[in-house]
């Protein structure tokens, strides 16, 4: 038996590296016409999202970026950042989703420390991004993410996200993953002493955590997930990959407020959302005019300090089921 074990080595017939981007290809094949993302007046099906991600990955290579390059995002919870969780690793590159609440000096430090090659920036953060790049040593190119809520001022010097996508094509062959221990994303701490610390996530960890979310929550097929948790926060606890794995629908929310959350929950029949205890507080403390009644169960996952008993009771009375998990992401 020992001899057999020694002879049984990895090969293409018995081993495939764990890779969460495979969830996208599978859901696009099995549920091509199911809604993948809804954001304001925009919506995409899974086959749309798959093609957009392939075009994004293709454009990265056609524009001269290489395997292993760090691609940064300073963005809200919009479709573009969701797509990046697939496009960037599909191109063999590493995603750096930054905390948009940081000042320009801290962002400049992250740009230099991670050796960032390209930065996608939401229009709301364009000024702070320009300041950060101007004092950084790496000086990455900026590509803007246009949003109908932010207008189009002072953007003539920059290419847009959609124009960048137009450079790519849907025939792009995803870069083969050789080792599941390779890095899929780098995230930086905030709120710690000294400079931010970079934390690497490997493909294996992202894949297993994405599936772990399903087990922990006993998540049903085709979930409707509301993006109240920032995607820059540990890659949204890996839920960008989880929702594709369960063929769900992502409801993107640019800014979190009690009115916006209740409206989305009622309109789209949201049955899953995540957030810090402050999000729970917003839901239970909202005034009567902001609350919109809904008849279905909405599951909420929260971390950090355990919510007070009164908050948990109020959440339950309002139609929410709370799961508290342990978090140490800072």
Specify the residue positions occupied by each region the protein language model found.
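Gly/Ser/Thr-rich phosphate-binding loop
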Residues: 245, 270-275, 284-330
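A short helix-loop-beta submotif of the ANL/AMP-binding
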Residues: 57, 69-70, 76-104, 112-118, ...
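Structural core segment of the AMP-binding/adenylate-forming
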Residues: 62-63, 90-163
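Conserved AMP-binding A3 loop
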Residues: 45-47, 184-208
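ATP-dependent adenylate-forming carboxylate-activation enzymes
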Residues: 75, 93-111, 123-128, 228, ...
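Conserved pre-ATP/AMP-binding loop-to-beta segment of ANL
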Residues: 32, 156-157, 166-188, 195, ...
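Conserved AMP-binding/adenylation subdomain of ANL enzymes
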Residues: 207-224, 232-272, 286
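Conserved AMP-binding/adenylate-forming core of the ANL superfamily
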Residues: 16, 25, 33-78, 82-86, ...
